[in-house]
Amino acid sequence: NLISIYIAFRFDRYYALGSLIALLHDVLITLGILSILNIEIGISIIAALLTIVGYSLNDTIVVYDRIRENMLKIIGDKKRTIINRSLNETLNRTVITSFTTMLVVSVLFFYGGSVLQSFAMTLIIGIVIGTYSSIYIASPLMYYFEEKYPIPEFIDKEV
């Protein structure tokens, strides 16, 4: 909750709402896959889930920061176009970061022993889901809520 308050102040309440729904998506999908794989939830899984939340939130904040930066820099384009451009600009960074993290976590999975396998498996699932949500869920949700429920003081008023 403290992180969502930070995002709401740093960016906007719609950014916070989009990121919270994306984080909820990440945790629930990861838990669902762990349930399907019959992996027991223990302290290492809880630690992995918290790591996933931090990792996914970091990815989302990078995208949101680029959106905010481009909103100030690019005048005249539609908000939807600016969000799309921002996602395209951060896509390379997001994919490369996720790929390199997956390499390290894969080493943990294969060589870490039985204790670290469930932790590493949870991270692998969570990184894939978190990367997906930071690109395809958080920003579109932010845009949707901004368009559907605009803040009254920011609506253009006709004279």
Please provide the spans of the model-predicted regions:
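Pore- and gate-forming transmembrane helices of large, multi-pass membrane proteins
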Residues: 19, 76-111, 121, 127, ...
